[in-house]
């Protein structure tokens, strides 16, 4: 029989590889306000759940699993206002830190009813955890070279700027008979490539927008950090059960939460913003994310929250950074590469020390 620790380390490696790569398919495609993207992505995760159910030949459908998936989705919904208020750089730093800290402390101190995890070398465990947090902080000082993509050069199924213009009547439906030819000519001429109205988050004055962004980032990280708690509680009552048995209900929670939000959004915003060319990349991104989360679930169950979760959550930063350096060329210059190297050293040391502390 394979050692559970070995399985846990393999799970952490899978999580690191696929979490670090799951947004690569949509990198060069428009995502708009992100709601359609996250819903299609959740469909991809559900496909992974069915595959896991087929492999394990056993599954449960526990309300606690739905809760776990919903907690993750709540954290993910915060990403849109975070990016609008404080940007992806600071936001990513804050939610990564709060996620790793929350997950580590949850297992270390037995929060939310989880059994406290005991390790052979507590001092090494703390040092490894501190190294991973330090690595995340170092990542913040990297200044990427990012070429902004103009999402208005893409055509959504119905552009936001069409709302209220000719072609959309007062009830929000397409007045095809009256303005079809007019609308087609405007679309071909680029008349609909107007700047959409700024969101409520972008209109907030400083420092309120910054405060909101920071609060949402920390909250989002906490949701990411506790989304595995229901699975851990279930595992404590089903010691011999496979983590693959829990995947379906957990991912169903993600799918149902995203579906509910997208339906409400589609009712309120008529018509919703959907980019056809982004649908398949979003679905593929969901497949990669689903595989990654299965790896994290395996790592967390076999290594515990204080080891498996930080390893599976910190490792993706290495992979995503390598994509940025060698493929997208976003991280350039001696200074940035030196900071990245220091981050890698701290992250690698932290993961290694965590493994040794077990």
Curated annotation (Swiss-Prot):
Membrane-crossing residue ranges in chain numbering: 6-26, 35-55, 60-79, 86-108, 122-142, 211-231, 244-264, 279-299, 307-327, 337-357
Predominant localisation class: membrane
Pfam families per the UniProt record, alphabetical: TMEM144 (PF07857)
UniProt keywords, alphabetically: Membrane, Transmembrane, Transmembrane helix
Gene Ontology CC: membrane
One GO molecular-function entry: carbohydrate transmembrane transporter activity
Cell compartments where the protein resides: Membrane
Membrane topology of the entry: Multi-pass membrane protein
The family this protein is said to belong to: Belongs to the TMEM144 family.
PANTHER family noted in UniProt: TRANSMEMBRANE PROTEIN 144, TRANSMEMBRANE PROTEIN 144 HOMOLOG B
Name of the protein this chain belongs to: Transmembrane protein 144 homolog B
Gene source species: Dictyostelium discoideum
Source species taxonomy: Eukaryota, Amoebozoa, Evosea, Eumycetozoa, Dictyostelia
